[in-house]
């Protein structure tokens, strides 16, 4: 009987961890979108303004797809949101790029979280997001 109870507790704990992981990933994606949009409105460079606008559009589309596929895997919804979404407002291009590099590292780290072969679809969408970020970083080299 003790084993059966331990299995139920273990399942609940695993389910709770999955919900927390889901919530953290979505929170980070919302933060990425907010940082890009806030910098888009803040920059005085037309080239940066246009590049961040295009990045935001692409990220918004791919992040939406990622989250919908992620939730669709177990037909779930996000029940519990992180209580705080950090609003980061980079003061300049250097700070903004540093934040973009942080998000790029976060995206690369998803490889360790999605190790099952059935998660290859999520990693493919993640790769599209990484591609958008890397192209954006290249385009930023033109904005002086």
Feature names for model-found ranges:
Residues 85-140:
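Acidic/histidine-rich alpha-helical segments that form the ligand environment
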